[in-house]
């Protein structure tokens, strides 16, 4: 179910404080965050976030196309290594 429009997009308070501080300083340092659930809003354009994927931090540069998505959508948590059985069958034949 989609979020109500009257509520507005969800952004964690600590992330919003870091965004406001980064806009004032404008030094280009990435913002380190574990908040994958925060929605990307227009105030974040031009900033880089280091989003935690459960193991490491993935750098995400925010552009206009990212608005409305969540930060976690750009930091995948799973890596697909492939199905080993299909490779073995091709080599054997």
Swiss-Prot record:
Keywords: Ribonucleoprotein, Ribosomal protein, RNA-binding, rRNA-binding. GO terms for molecular function: rRNA binding; structural constituent of ribosome. Transmembrane segments: none annotated. Pfam families: Ribosomal_S19. This is Small ribosomal subunit protein uS19. The keyword 4Fe-4S does not apply. It comes from Campylobacter lari (strain RM2100 / D67 / ATCC BAA-1060). GO terms for biological process: ribosomal small subunit assembly; translation. Protein S19 forms a complex with S13 that binds strongly to the 16S ribosomal RNA. The keyword Transmembrane helix does not apply.
